[in-house]
Amino acid sequence: MPEGPSIVILREAAGHLAGRKVLDVTGNSTQDIQRLRNRTLRGVHSWGKHFLLAFDGFSVRIHFLLFGSWRINEAKDRPERLGLHFSGGEVLNVYACSVRFIKGALDDAYDWSADVMGTAWNPATARRRLRARPDALVADALLDQDVFAGVGNIIKNEVLHRIRVHPESRIGALPARKLSQLVDEARTYSFDFYEWKQAYVLKKHYQVHTKRVCPRDGTPLSYRKQLGLAQRRAFWCETCQRRYGADTSAVAEPARAPRRP
């Protein structure tokens, strides 16, 4: 699933399409995508994992789910979910994704302060929302898009390793300093992810995600296919990542070579 930094990269790559008129619309979306024909694209935006195309009176929300992808001025050898053919010969194709229409202004639909890579990101708001969920696992809290819009499973695993917190720690048990580190590092790592992704070196910087040994102390990493309410893959080090709060979970599976993401 593309995480927030990847959507920012797409937003920047597609930004020049704003102001262009849609001359033709293709795709197998079940939505009424033909309403986009002869409309002028007013803006290209992102919120977390949502890619947003703004038109007069409404916007198109694209969520890339688990296997979605996109192409600008080229096509894949499979049917597109939505293809927008703009004036000037520009084309935007998106694949294997969810396409939805949003009525009205985007400001009415989105809380921009929750977007970890946005200019309106508010860490104080994130801390307040976390404190309202004292029993939540930190692994689930990081994936809560109402708190950390754009954070996905890779960022989750890497952030928790960076701040030395076990994924099954409870939010309410974290010291204030650790809670602040959790919030701050979610944003910091997202921008690191963005830079590495643009340079095509992201996977080279993984410390624990899909790895077998902790690079900090050499301990075999613990791995679970499904952890927390989110039921997402988790990789962590029992030596350097401290568990805060009561442990109510099962014993982790032994470390082993994980499947490719």
Identify the residue ranges that each predicted region occupies.
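Structured catalytic/nucleic-acid-binding cores of DNA maintenance enzymes
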Residues: 1-261
